[in-house]
Regions:
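Eukaryote-biased RCC1-like beta-propeller repeat architecture
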Residues: 2-486
Length: 486
């Protein structure tokens, strides 16, 4: 990789197969909210209260749009695996053809959009489906849909972008994809969910196994400004800095000081999961000798979810992490799981404060207030892991604009270039081409040289990007790229 520096300057701990049953009943009072519903903005005790959630949103005010609006429109580019059922698998599931969809080894334009410009893209490191929002506010979805995660009313796979009818009339300003579920955020601060709900990850207050039509999450607190999905849990952030979680609590992923396990019998274990959003009320600092101090007045401003962990930033540029601690992905120089958000001492302000965080499946990337990227966890399937945040030296001197994190791959838009890396096996999500499919060190994506990427998101084995197309010169370069059509 060409350097652009300033002159002054083990193996994933896989979760064992869970031989547990998921109980629909709320049987333990220890999981009740530590604050009342008015403060938490949640209906923590179940479906009856959830029914009181707002249904008519027409009178709700719009959230203030950022300068420039809800995302700058551009041309959608895509690379990676398009056989969605094969993502993360060596063999196709029973009844699924192995050759439906191919790998796009370099970035392609998407013919089926019919030249529609796109202002928002979303996927997730565990997801084999994607969300795209067009300039004229259509919410389009495509990819795997076996649990109804596309929200289109059925469970049929979509290769061609399909509009979500349930969201017509809404302006979608944010979205996130879990393994088999999806969250949509509208401009009025309302959250809709679809997909697998076996563990409550859709937050609709019901125990339905699948939610095939986009349905409003049972929440009635302050407007929501951001949504995020782990593999089997969800996070939403309100306008006042309150963070709420729901879904599977395994490894402490929900941040409620529990992993949700309980015994039904001497040999039978189950999980208590959260079916509606519940506020995270405790943030702590732990010293080297194990002393724990609660922190007051924490207002979260941003967050990112990995498969089973979350990293969040507060208004003081402090970073907190919790959930599964394997291979150092939480940045605390140890592998213990954290059941509540814990301050990352290695990223403490003022000299080391954080302005952005991005989580992959088993790793995290923080961009500090000086613009340097630091990684903790493990992007490779083997080898040494970063137990605490360490600078990514190959990105030193680049002005990082946006980051996409996949299972083991990372794609970064910086200055007028795109930089990517990821260990084998890869399926084209890095965009290097068929001759060199992977790289364990950051490399520039030559196919995008001279193009300005404004947004990046990564799925399990694919990457979406929005490319600026304001000038004739930029459009001419885009037209030279290969075209993907279904």
């Amino acid at each position: 990789m060409s350097t652009k520096r300033k002159n002054t300057g083990g193996k994933k701990n896989r979760a064992k197969s869970r031989k547990v049953e998921y109980d629909d009943e709320d049987i333990s009072s220890e999981h009740n909210s530590e604050v009342d519903d008015a403060e938490a903005g949640s209906n923590a005790d179940g479906e009856d209260a959830a029914e009181d959630a707002l249904t008519d949103v027409s009178d709700m005010p719009e959230l203030p749009a950022p300068e420039g609006g809800w995302g700058k429109p551009g041309t959608l580019l895509m690379c990676g695996l398009t056989n969605w059922e094969m993502a993360g698998r060596k063999a196709p599931p029973k009844g699924i053809k192995a050759n439906v969809g191919r790998s796009l080894w370099t970035p392609h334009t998407f013919k089926n959009l019919n030249n529609a410009r796109v202002r928002l893209i979303a996927s997730g490191p565990a997801a084999s489906h994607s969300i795209i929002i067009t300039e004229d506010n259509r919410c389009l979805v495509f990819g795997k849909n076996d649990k109804g995660q596309l929200g289109v009313g059925d469970s049929k796979r979509r290769d061609e972008p399909t509009e979500v009818e349930a969201l017509k009339g809404h302006t979608v300003i944010g979205a996130s994809c879990g393994r088999n579920h999806t969250l949509f955020l509208t401009s009025r601060g309302i959250v809709f969910a679809a997909g697998d709900n076996k563990l409550g990850q859709c937050g609709v207050g019901k125990s339905d196994a699948c939610i095939v039509t986009a349905t409003k999450v049972k929440y009635s607190g302050p407007p929501i400004v951001k949504v995020g999905c782990g593999a089997e849990f969800s996070m939403i952030l309100d306008i006042k800095g309150g963070l709420y979680s729901f879904g599977c609590p395994e490894y402490g992923a929900l941040g409620h000081n529990t992993d949700g396990k309980y015994f039904i019998t001497n040999t039978k274990m189950a999980f208590h999961y959260e079916k509606v959003p519940k506020r995270i009320v405790l943030y702590v600092e732990r010293t080297k000798d194990g002393h724990v101090t609660p922190l007051d007045r924490v207002e979260i401003t941003d967050f990112s979810c990995g498969h089973y962990h979350t990293v969040a930033i507060d208004s003081k540029s402090r970073a907190f992490s919790w959930g599964f601690g394997g291979v150092g992905r939480l940045g605390h120089n140890e592998q213990r799981d954290e059941l509540v958000p814990r301050l990352i001492k290695f990223l403490e302000p003022p000299s080391r404060g954080v302005r952005a965080v991005h989580c992959g499946s088993t790793y995290s990337i923080a961009i500090n207030v000086h613009g340097f990227a630091l990684m903790f966890g493990q992007t490779k399937r083997t080898g040494e892991a970063n137990m605490y945040p360490k600078p990514i030296q190959d990105l030193s001197g680049w002005e990082i604009r946006c980051v996409g994190c996949s299972q083991t791959s990372v794609v970064v838009a910086a200055d007028d270039s795109v930089i990517a890396w990821g260990a084998s096996p890869t399926f084209g999500e890095l965009g290097f081409g068929e001759m060199r499919k992977s790289s364990t060190t950051p490399m520039e994506v030559k196919a995008l040289e001279g193009l300005y990427i404004t947004a990046v998101t990564c799925g399990l084995s694919h990457t979406l990007m929005i490319c600026r197309d304001d000038t004739e010169e930029e459009r001419a370069k885009i037209n030279k790229l290969q075209v993907y059509s279904v």
